[in-house]
């Protein structure tokens, strides 16, 4: 009875042994490396450039800015600012200097307790009362916020200058200035631009002592204006201040500073032409988009997924250089850039850069501006001959 079972059993054993012998080769084929795929063909440069230009022209901050301006025009503190900020307006009647006119601002009530940070006590939105002339000025400012590269050509007259300045030094705040001994060279220029109220006392040998224009962003002014004893002209009464607006509600800080008793005889604070703001924003965004595509290999449309596109902004230094390009016959730039052994700012202990700026993209723009300005997008439509620009390190 056992004999008939031997042959089927032998066949089954043979099949099992064959399967076991072939399993390693099957396994190697199943888990082996995937076939190498051919790389994607590079995007046509002209097509890529057109995409970058199109995306750089998009402004996701326009809608919220429009809402903030509407709030101010209707006498309300903008919702984007009311939650965490307040403006300590000095007195019941203030003046905002804008476009060479004075515009009164009225309000009811005040903050009698100066021991408390006014940022913790926002003004009730219904208490802000703007003069009709101020409403017209704000409306005009927002209406001018459009792309017009020709604004560079008109900067001397917009800034009430008698003509172009022979030579300008734009002094940044990088720690690379320490030990550079550029002070005398900086002061030898016809005009010296400084950024964001950077301190010069004690640093004159490296950063110079002369100041002809103070260029600041409105966040810096806001931090000063919220303090009861703020003096908005740290370089002296005779040094004009040119300010670009980061939030529409910061116009109230301009009013506060211009109306303070210590500023009555000082040079007024001027606001940058919004067309210049738009031009600077487009240039920097273009270079940021280009850097993103080159470094990641991803589509330019994905740039906004890595940044807060509505908050993305150029730096104060970048716009100061653009102003110099528009009003100076020769531009020298100091204190821009980084070094491993240098502080972020020569005058402070700030450790890191702000995320809303793309400094590497701005450095790429500076290289093109100095070496081949004809390739800078949007700038080549300004209708001006870009003056020589030299960066000192």
Curated annotation (Swiss-Prot):
Report the InterPro entries cross-referenced here.
Glyco_trans_29, GT29-like_sf
Q: Per the UniProt entry, what is one GO biological process?
A: protein glycosylation
- Superkingdom field: Eukaryota
Q: Where in the cell is it found?
A: Golgi apparatus membrane
Q: How does it sit in the membrane?
A: Single-pass type II membrane protein
According to its UniProt record, the EC number is 2.4.99.-
Side Lumenal, residues: 28-393
* TM segment ranges: 9-27
Quote the cellular component terms of the Gene Ontology held in the record.
Golgi membrane
Q: Name one GO molecular function term.
A: sialyltransferase activity
The answer to whether keyword Ligase applies is no
The answer to whether UniProt assigns keyword Membrane to this entry is yes
Q: Which UniProt keywords apply?
A: Glycoprotein, Glycosyltransferase, Golgi apparatus, Membrane, Signal-anchor, Transferase, Transmembrane, Transmembrane helix
Q: In which tissues is it expressed?
A: Expressed in leaves and stalks. Expressed at low levels in roots.
Q: Which residues are glycosylated?
A: 49, 212, 258
Q: Which PANTHER family match?
A: BETA-1,6-GALACTOSYLTRANSFERASE GALT29A (PTHR46779:SF1)
Q: What does this protein do?
A: Possesses sialyltransferase-like activity in vitro. Transfers sialic acid to the oligosaccharide Gal-beta-1,3-GalNAc and to glycoproteins such as asialofetuin, alpha-1-acid glycoprotein (NeuAc-alpha-2,3-Gal-beta-1,3-GalNAc-) and andasialo-alpha-1-acid glycoprotein. The transferred sialic acid is linked to galactose of Gal-beta-1,3-GalNAc through alpha-2,6-linkage.
Q: What is this protein called?
A: Sialyltransferase-like protein 1
Source species, please?
Oryza sativa subsp. japonica
Top-level taxonomy? Eukaryota, Viridiplantae, Streptophyta, Embryophyta, Tracheophyta
- What gene is this protein a product of? STLP1
